[in-house]
Regions:
Chain B
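A structural signal for multi-pass alpha-helical bundles of membrane permease subunits
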Residues: 4-304
Length: 421, 304
């Protein structure tokens, strides 16, 4: 063909190529570290991709939430455009608020159906920085077959829990299960320990580390007594190794059938009821116990989805976020993976309750859950949490009494606060 | 002569430029950060604050908020932990390395194979071997506890990496396992350069082997031995990966590098963290100088 025809052909090819590539965008989503989270997220992200003609690839974040935050902050400092959609922990919006996109114009009011407390947590300076994806609360898992065997009921107070754990542990060990433990939780020095310890402190009436007005309230005797009680479990009803347990390690001990009680997040239910689990059908879930004269409380956790300001496909990314947090997807995830929805009326959904019977009682637990002081301490929250988990760790490791540790913690928090949060 | 100087400079300039880019600029920027209050949230917004990160009201040293004194504060504790770890670790590695080197210096069947095999702990990347040891030392389903329990050496399972009283020494043990081959190899190299006629004469005279070791071998390998110890000590003072992977990383077992990482990466305080890392460099430099002074290490060619 002559040069004019080949010129036309080239122009048509170029036009086709550019329109094709401008439609098929490639997004990257960071949404989880363990295999179950990754599988669930990939499934729904790919559904969206097929529907809209884009591709979504997965970025696997580190398992520990403290490490994931540290990595994310470095990427923001470099204004990296590799991440489009990010799974954001409940305590992060105040810390990374300068790097997230305001989702109000994309959500068009959809957030009204979500838990108000979580939406308020995600709204910083009037901007909705993240859509709530799944709620998480600390729960008490127990072996209902063992409680029946020894004629016990799920404990209402921490003292009940300790007594029941001691009784069953001794009996099981004499009966031949050599390493049976009474109670496992997360005792490693990381954000998970802050969640566990806040539950103990608040349920004893010791307050929430820093109150809503910004005053440091942690140095009181109720908090000290809560931590001393927890320290008394380590070495008696809890293995000494709990000081190095994160969520997966404690779940490992419980799922092998070697613990009576476990404190963990909601995800452990689906894994405990899986076909190959040794404890399938033998577990029950209840709210965490109360301290003396206090009330039952769980730490509010949960993950949200946000869009990075440095992404090259902000509109598409926001669309993906709204798809993943929509009613249909949240319902499917609740049924398949026991992820607690963040849309309030899904807790009355028959199909979800058929698979996760305890979710009906969760609305109250989530509604009354205690939040970590991340909003009031803003960008200094990582240091506050660090100081708190260090102090708790010292008490659990029997290096300091509750009172000494709380006094030292107060001094440290003053140093972190400087003149203002 | 001028021509030779010019040629020398032509060869040196690329290396110097590369070193300035890769090592000089980051180092300079780090020291600059240590004089500011930069935070990772907005790196361009840092203000110059002089030596406040080092000696100011919220600084590393001389901080009035250290309610229990400098050595109980996080920074002071990390310095103490690091030195405890380094001294014990280097001494144990030197002794073990010396023993292994003396053995490998003998002539026996399969010596080449033994020399290669001894290198395996050093060759495995630290992260991999630390994770491996972490699983073996797990308190509930670890191999070590199982074996010790079966042999009746312990009454119940010990939380090697979680219990603060055991954690540091467990890390020392794993570090000794990992680095003894390095020391052994350096000492072996020194032993192989020793003149054989000394030993021939000693054998003819019927000198006791132990006396031979103290009076002949040790003085002759003293210089290379001190060099190996300085290398190891500089490495040990920078320990990070073993402690990070094996232990729970709370304040009581944290090392100086761990403190720097915590401040810079987790808390996002680039200014304060850079001050800590600059102090770390100076402390290591001082320790090396002190050690070499005490050991009367002469690195030049004039031998005694």
């Amino acid at each position: 063909m002559n040069s004019r025809q080949s010129c036309h052909l080239a122009a048509v090819a170029l036009a086709l190529w550019t329109t094709a590539s401008s439609q098929a965008a490639s997004l990257t989503i960071s949404c989880g570290s363990n295999a179950a989270q990754v599988a669930s997220c990939t499934k729904f992200a790919e559904e969206w991709g097929k529907k809209t003609g884009n591709t979504v690839s997965l970025y696997q974040a580190p398992a520990s939430t403290s490490e994931a935050l540290a990595l994310l902050r470095q990427q923001f400092a470099a204004k990296a455009s590799e991440l489009d959609v990010i799974m954001v922990d409940l305590v992060w919006p105040g810390i990374i608020k300068d790097h997230l996109v305001d989702l109000k114009k994309y959500s068009k009011g959809a957030e009204a159906k979500f838990f108000p407390a979580i939406v308020a947590n995600n709204t910083v300076g009037g901007k909705l920085l993240a859509m709530p994806w799944y709620a998480n609360v600390g729960l008490l898992y127990y072996r209902k077959d063992l409680l029946e065997k020894y004629g016990l009921k799920p404990p209402e107070t921490w003292a009940n829990l300790a007594a029941a754990a001691k009784k069953v542990q001794e009996a099981e060990r004499t009966a031949g299960v050599k390493d049976f433990q009474g109670f496992v939780f997360q005792g490693k020095a990381y954000e998970g320990l802050t969640c566990n310890a806040l539950e103990w402190v608040y349920s004893f009436g010791g307050g929430e580390i820093v109150d809503a007005a910004g005053s440091i309230t942690i140095n009181n005797d109720k908090a000290a007594r809560a931590l001393d009680a927890a320290a008394s479990w380590v070495g008696t009803i809890t293995p000494g190794g709990v000081l190095n347990y994160a969520e997966e390690e404690s779940r490992g001990v419980f799922q092998k059938g070697e613990a009576l009680f476990m404190r963990n997040w909601a995800y452990a239910w689906a894994l405990g009821q899986a076909a190959d689990s040794p404890i399938k059908g033998k577990i029950g879930v209840s709210p965490l116990p109360a301290g003396p004269g206090g009330k039952k409380v769980a730490t509010l956790g949960g993950w949200q989805l946000a869009v990075s300001k440095y992404s090259k496909n902000v509109d598409l990314a926001a669309d993906l976020v709204l798809y993943l947090t929509s009613r249909e997807v949240q319902k499917k995830r609740a049924i398949e993976g026991s992820y607690n929805p963040t849309i309030v009326d899904l807790y009355n959904d028959k199909d979800i309750l058929a698979v996760n019977p305890f979710m009906g009682s969760l609305t109250d637990i989530v509604g009354s859950a205690v939040a970590r002081p991340s909003t009031v301490t803003g960008a200094k929250y990582p240091e506050v949490s660090n100081a708190f988990w260090d102090a708790t760790y010292d008490v659990l490791a029997k290096k300091a009494s509750g009172a000494e540790a709380m006094k030292k913690l107060q001094g440290k928090l003053k140093q972190v606060k400087r003149s203002q949060w | 002569m001028r021509n030779r100087t010019r040629i020398a400079w032509t060869f040196l300039v690329p290396t110097l430029v590369l070193m300035a880019m890769v090592a000089g600029w980051p180092l300079g920027r780090s020291i600059w950060f240590s004089l500011t209050d930069t935070s990772i949230n907005d790196i361009s917004a840092g203000k110059f604050i002089g030596l406040a990160n080092y000696f100011g009201e919220f600084g590393l040293f001389a901080n009035p908020n250290y309610t229990e004194g400098f050595w109980k504060s996080d920074w002071g504790l990390s310095i103490r932990n690091t030195f405890q770890f380094s001294i014990v670790s280097v001494v144990l590695e030197t002794l073990a390395g010396l023993g292994v080197a003396m053995l490998l210096n003998q002539d026996f069947k399969g010596r080449t194979l033994a020399r290669a095999a001894v290198l395996i702990p050093w060759a495995i990347p630290t992260i991999v071997s630390a994770k491996m040891w972490g699983w073996m030392l797990h308190d509930q389903y670890g191999l070590i506890n199982q074996v010790l329990l079966d042999w009746g050496l312990i009454a119940h399972k010990i939380a090697w990496t979680a219990d603060p009283s055991y954690a540091l020494w467990t890390v020392v043990a794993v570090d000794v396992w990992k680095t003894t081959p390095f020391m052994a190899l350096l000492i072996l190299a020194a032993l192989q350069t020793l003149p054989k006629d000394c030993y021939e004469a000693a054998r003819v005279d019927g000198v006791h082997p132990l006396r031979l070791f103290w009076k002949v071998t040790l003085p002759l390998i003293k210089q290379p031995l001190m060099v190996a110890m300085v290398f190891r000590m500089l490495d040990a003072l920078r320990i990070f990966d073993l402690i990070y992977v094996l232990t729970s990383n709370n304040s009581t077992t944290i090392s100086m590098s761990g403190f720097v990482r915590r401040e810079m990466v987790e808390n996002g305080n680039l200014g304060y963290g850079s001050a800590a890392s600059t102090s770390l460099t100076l402390i290591i430099f001082l320790s090396a100088v002190l050690f070499m002074r005490t050991a009367r290490l002469k690195l030049s060619e004039e031998s005694s």
